[in-house]
């Protein structure tokens, strides 16, 4: 499935590969690689509420800021897991985390086969990088929040994602 013009980069329309997920959808599986080159699937990410922050490349200003922001938020949200996904090589992700003391988010790379991007609808066909997006996945592996940022160079709505994650964590905790 391709979604022509679903995103733009500096105003230029681009095609996203994969479905457009919405709240209520089952979170699709994926196969990503951690910075130790080990495969990681959805099941491996645990049963906590997860914020999945998707960025094109850590070496760009907005991606850098987005990942640092979620690293700061992770310190205040001990019962949540925050994952950053990009097409950067695991070695580059590890270097970037070390350079900027980012140690509270789990970095995962989709460079190997792009399965995350294809399954979550974030793979930019023309560039073979991820688009900017945020997903919140609850303990039952249901998507409770999905934001595809229309202009790749723009920031996502951090507060909306954080509110959805807090709500999912407290709703489940009170059952």
Show the residue positions of the predicted features.
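Chalcogenol-based redox active-site neighborhoods
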Residues: 1-175
């Amino acid at each position: 499935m391709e979604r022509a013009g679903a995103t733009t980069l500096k105003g230029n329309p681009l095609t996203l590969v994969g479905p457009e997920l919405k709240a209520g959808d089952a979170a699709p599986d994926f196969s990503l690689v951690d910075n130790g080159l080990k495969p990681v699937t959805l099941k491996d990410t645990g049963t906590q509420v997860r914020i999945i922050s998707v960025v094109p490349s850590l070496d760009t200003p907005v991606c850098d800021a987005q990942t640092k922001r979620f690293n700061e938020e992770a310190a205040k949200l001990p019962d949540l897991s925050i994952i950053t996904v990009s097409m950067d090589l695991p070695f580059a992700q590890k270097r970037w985390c070390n350079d900027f003391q980012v140690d509270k988010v789990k970095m995962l790379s989709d460079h190997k086969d792009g399965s995350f991007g294809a399954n979550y609808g974030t793979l930019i066909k023309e560039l073979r990088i991820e688009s900017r997006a945020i997903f919140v996945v609850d303990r039952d592996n249901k998507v409770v929040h999905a934001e595809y940022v229309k202009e790749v160079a723009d920031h996502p709505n951090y507060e909306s994602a954080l509110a959805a994650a807090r709500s999912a964590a407290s709703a489940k905790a009170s059952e």
